[in-house]
Amino acid sequence: MKQRGVGVAFLLIAFALSAGGCDVIEKFKQKAKDKADKAASAEPSGPLSSDPDEALGLKLNGPIECINNASGQVSRSRDRYVSWFPDAKAGPTGKEKIVYGLYKVTPTFVERCKKELAGYRKVKEPPTADLDKLADTYEAKLDAVVPLIETAAKYYEAKDYEDDKLAKAKTMHPGLMKAFDEFNDADKALRAELKKLKSGMADRELAKVEKTEGKKLRWNHLKTNMVAEKVVQMGDEDPSKLDAAAFETLLKEYEAQVDA
């Protein structure tokens, strides 16, 4: 039996080395790859956990990945862009002494975001209808702004503005700013809905801990984190629109919670 096995193995190797054998091997390799790709993309459509809040939290990871990375890339590019001319609405004047251009968006962050959103859409439970719509809008606005950033970045990197006296820059500006602003609106809306969903989860978890353990160490830890997150979120708001009295009240609540 051993000699027969060696003989069969030899024949298989000889076949694999032939032209026909190579074709068959390639077909098997491609078939295996296709099967692996299909398995990798087969995210579950049902809840990701038997615990409702845990299932929701896991589902939200997709959109959160986008705002943590892709959004930051677009925001960074916009900030750089509007930093070197006096009026963001009017755009480049042609009189600027220094032209910085704008930062490109790293493709991997965009690709990862889109992959995460694709996985998010496959998970139907728990239902998140409002978030679904906002995520669709977010992705559409991301797809709209990224190519415009890329085109503008290439123009500035090549220093074409030195040849045309920023003529193309002035032409590009309205469309670029419109795309930036629309993406920013979509990003804010997505963040607000995520904040609402996460806040509800935190409130339910706090109530659950209070019921089972009382207002002890774990409850205080959760409560402190909740208040701290609210402080950070309010602190990130536009200073001109910040409710100073409400922020002061929140800070006092945080201090009291830390001392509890």
Briefly describe each language-model feature range.
Residues 1-9:
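Bacterial N-terminal signal peptides that target proteins for export
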Residues 23-26:
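Bacterial signal peptide processing site
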Residues 18-21:
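C-terminal motif of bacterial Sec signal peptides marking the signal peptidase cleavage site
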Residues 36, 40-181:
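Leu/Val/Ala/Ile-rich N-terminal alpha-helices, chiefly Sec-type signal peptides and the beginnings
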Residues 169-260:
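Extended amphipathic alpha-helical interaction segments
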